[in-house]
């Protein structure tokens, strides 16, 4: 049998039986999707690959907990979202500590976000990164990863109505963040 014809459930059973090639196939099948989700959550940076690897390590270590109640892609995406949220928390803590150190040493804080980069993708990505994690996760899953409302609700363990309202709020916030950019380009 060719690897791409084997179902996810068959791969999981093979992994449980010690087949390392089945695990490699799961990684190959879902790595780009998982990295895209992580990148949408934390931005394009060196940590994306590290967190992506951690997703598959966590999956492997918890393989016996996977009951197949949701698709494997949903399960892996949930792990990716959780690890991304952990990274966001770590960054906020690091930033808070560095700001406290700067203030205690009497240094000046300068605004480094006022760059002159006209790359649309980067501008949009920066705007997405400004969203709070709860809005960003819904936006990334629905609009970037193209999950349905129901799939997004399952991944985030939220009611579908909450997904829809967060998506609407995320889009409003994103529009607010991007409005100055588009106004400057319309002139």
Which positions does each model-derived feature cover?
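Short, charged helix-capping/linker segments at alpha-helix termini
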Residues: 1-2, 16-25, 35-54, 160, ...
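C-terminal edge and immediately downstream basic/flexible tail or linker adjoining helix-turn-helix-like DNA-binding
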Residues: 2-5, 14, 43, 96-100, ...
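Helix-turn-helix DNA-binding module
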Residues: 9, 129-137, 141-162, 173
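Structural recognition of an alpha-helix C-terminal capping motif at a helix-to-coil junction
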Residues: 50-57, 70-82
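Arg/Lys-rich amphipathic alpha helix in sigma70-family domain 2
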Residues: 65-68, 78-99
């Amino acid at each position: 049998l060719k690897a791409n014809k084997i179902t996810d459930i068959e791969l999981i059973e093979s992994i449980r039986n010690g087949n390392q090639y089945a695990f490699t196939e799961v990684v190959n099948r879902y790595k780009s999707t998982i990295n895209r989700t992580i990148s949408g959550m934390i931005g394009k940076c060196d940590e994306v690959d590290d967190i992506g690897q951690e997703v598959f390590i966590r999956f492997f270590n918890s393989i016996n907990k996977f009951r197949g109640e949701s698709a494997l892609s949903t399960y892996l995406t949930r792990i990716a979202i959780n690890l991304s949220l952990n990274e966001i928390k770590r960054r906020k803590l690091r930033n808070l500590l560095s700001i406290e150190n700067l203030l205690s040493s009497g240094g000046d804080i300068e605004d480094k976000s006022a760059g002159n980069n006209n790359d649309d993708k980067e501008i949009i990505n920066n705007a997405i990164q400004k969203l709070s994690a709860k809005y960003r996760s819904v936006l990334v899953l629905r609009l970037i990863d193209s999950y349905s409302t129901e799939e997004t609700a399952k991944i985030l363990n939220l009611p579908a109505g909450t997904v829809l309202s967060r998506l609407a709020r995320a889009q409003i916030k994103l529009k607010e963040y991007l409005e100055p950019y588009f106004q400057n380009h319309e002139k």
